[in-house]
Swiss-Prot record:
It comes from Conus ventricosus. The presence of a 'disulfide through disulfide knot' structurally defines this protein as a knottin. The cysteine framework is VI/VII (C-C-CC-C-C). It is found in: Secreted. This is Conotoxin VnMEKL-023. Expressed by the venom duct.
Length: 77
């Protein structure tokens, strides 16, 4: 009886893995991957010149890497 149970379990595992292989497994939506891959760290934004470091001139919070503009200069925090 134990051998039959083990044999049935092995058969079920083999069938499920075969179904995953044929079906391509779990497919994640590409839009979600693209969205997450577009995010950059603060250092990457600064290195590529997309934001300004502290003590640089700014007009809006988005100008600063810290997202903290006092109206004239970027603040550190």
């Amino acid at each position: 009886m134990q051998k039959l149970t083990i044999l049935l379990l092995v058969a079920a595992v083999l069938m499920s893995t075969q179904a995953l292989i044929k079906g391509g497994g779990e497919k994640r939506p590409k839009e979600k991957i693209r969205f997450l891959s577009k995010r950059k760290t603060t250092a990457e934004r600064w290195w590529e010149g997309e934001c300004r470091g502290w003590s640089n001139g700014c007009t809006t919070n988005s100008d600063c890497c810290s997202n903290n503009c006092d109206g004239t200069f970027c603040k550190l925090w």
